């Protein structure tokens, strides 16, 4: 790497709001430290459920205009995190949000049905352009099993593997963004007052997450919570944030904590120094950027 090279990170996400919910604090953290941060979004999020009545008729079973509206939400969210406007894989609208398992096709190519050679090639081209030191996407289950998240995992994994030969760039560190069961448990237990219509749950009711022994890295995003919460509020058709900014809910009204840490599993590359828990505290740890 060249002398005094600026660190470059690439986050690959399925829909608008995923970048904020899973990695928003990390994005803001590295932007604040003058890293070059890129976010690629694979669909417009057309199949999302809409919170509230104001824009409810944008949904797929009415005007089917939600995807276009969510471009503005994603733009505002990225600005809150310190970035410019969105970048969509293949161009805005090239692949459609697939919806949850069992959602019917809407007449355009769904992301879950994307030709893998085309999709991987598009992301390889981004990797060749950005030459990221770190790439982040979902685990094989897509976090919670959403078909588009799983497809994003497959495409990103194949693109990282293909990039050395295709564009001459080997990604030094490749991570999955994951939920730490311990952090979620503590966050749920610490929840204060939430809107009366929200549903409180226990950690055992959330069917995904990783144990501490499976986690390789954590980023303390406490200082970035105002930026993350601002980005969450920008995704107003998808996320409701509690007045105090410490909890949020999606369209299912399940109360979830806004956590001050974001957790990762290192898939490939050499880990840097680890703390007493065995975790890196910097996704760039171990990289020689001088």
UniProtKB/Swiss-Prot annotation:
What are its E.C. numbers? 3.5.1.103
* Pfam families in the cross-refs: PIG-L (PF02585)
List the GO biological process terms.
mycothiol biosynthetic process
At the top level, the lineage of the source is Bacteria
Give the cofactor binding note: Binds 1 zinc ion per subunit.
Residues annotated as coiled-coil are none
What does the UniProt keyword field contain?
Answer: Hydrolase, Metal-binding, Zinc
Q: Which family does it belong to?
A: Belongs to the MshB deacetylase family.
Q: Which PANTHER family match?
A: 1D-MYO-INOSITOL 2-ACETAMIDO-2-DEOXY-ALPHA-D-GLUCOPYRANOSIDE DEACETYLASE, N-ACETYLGLUCOSAMINYL-PHOSPHATIDYLINOSITOL DE-N-ACETYLASE-RELATED
Q: What is this protein called?
A: 1D-myo-inositol 2-acetamido-2-deoxy-alpha-D-glucopyranoside deacetylase
Provenance organism: Mycolicibacterium smegmatis (strain ATCC 700084 / mc(2)155) (Mycobacterium smegmatis)
């Amino acid at each position: 790497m060249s002398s005094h090279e600026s660190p470059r990170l690439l986050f690959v996400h399925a829909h608008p709001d995923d970048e904020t919910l899973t990695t928003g604090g990390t994005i803001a953290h590295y932007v604040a430290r003058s890293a070059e941060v890129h976010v690629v979004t694979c669909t417009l999020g057309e199949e999302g459920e809409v919170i509230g009545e104001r824009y409810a008729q944008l949904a797929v079973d009415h005007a089917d205009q939600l995807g276009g509206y969510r471009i503005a939400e994603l733009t505002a969210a990225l600005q809150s995190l310190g970035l410019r406007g969105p970048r969509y894989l293949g161009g805005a609208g090239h692949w459609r949000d697939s919806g949850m398992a069992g959602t019917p096709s809407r007449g355009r190519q769904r992301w879950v049905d994307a030709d893998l050679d085309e999709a991987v090639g598009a992301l390889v081209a981004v990797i060749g352009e950005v030459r990221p030191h770190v790439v982040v996407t979902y685990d094989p289950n897509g976090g919670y099993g959403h078909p588009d998240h799983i497809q994003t995992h497959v495409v990103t994994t194949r693109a990282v593997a293909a990039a050395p030969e295709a564009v001459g760039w080997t990604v030094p560190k490749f991570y999955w963004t994951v939920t730490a069961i311990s952090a979620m448990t503590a966050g749920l237990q610490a929840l204060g007052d939430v809107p009366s219509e929200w549903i409180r749950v226990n950690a055992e009711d959330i069917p995904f997450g990783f144990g501490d022994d499976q986690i390789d890295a954590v980023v303390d995003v406490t200082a970035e919570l105002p930026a993350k919460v601002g980005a969450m509020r920008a995704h107003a058709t998808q996320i409701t944030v509690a007045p105090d900014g410490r909890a949020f809910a999606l369209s299912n009204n399940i109360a979830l904590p806004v956590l001050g840490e974001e957790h990762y599993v290192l898939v490939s590359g050499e880990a840097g120094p680890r703390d007493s828990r065995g975790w890196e505290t910097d996704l760039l740890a171990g990289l020689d950027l001088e």
